[in-house]
Amino acid sequence: DLPGMVYAAAEASPIHWQPWVKESREMARKSHKLMLVVIAIPQQASCALTPSRLSSDPSAVAEINRSYVPILVDGDAVRELGILTADLCSEISSGLHFPLMVWMTPDCDPVAWIPLVPNESGSVVELFSQSHGMVGNMWEEDHGYVSRNSRMDQENRSARIRIRASERELSAEPAADSLRALRQLTTLYD
């Protein structure tokens, strides 16, 4: 029993959601499956709906349970994945969006990811099906290649993230800038 709305929304799901724990990653390794990780945050209503939308399609449920170790993550509770979401969205020139569906190797290297943006074309099930067709086929054809390539991509991504972090311009007057930003935010609500 895990606390929070994100996990409660998936309790009765026919998808065999697992928590983000070592045993789940080991399950993926032993079964030679990718992990299908859905990172959500409870503050967004669409996050609670995503597991139920996926669960409403019997063919998606069967494919997820057969092909992946499905993992549901509360981005607030598992902060490292919440932070990873920002970096992954940045990599595809997208704003930060939750929930984020990520296909990961058993070594936790992202293979592919897609933000599940509400009110955009395509339902959650359609987005899953399209991506599954591509990612699932690549994994079936040569999971060794996918693992090596994803590891290399993750190393390169980490290097880019470190460079971006070191290039960030820090404020010369953090207190004054913070106060100015707070005043600007306050005017939005006046």
Describe each PLM feature range.
Residues 1-190:
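Replace the tail clause
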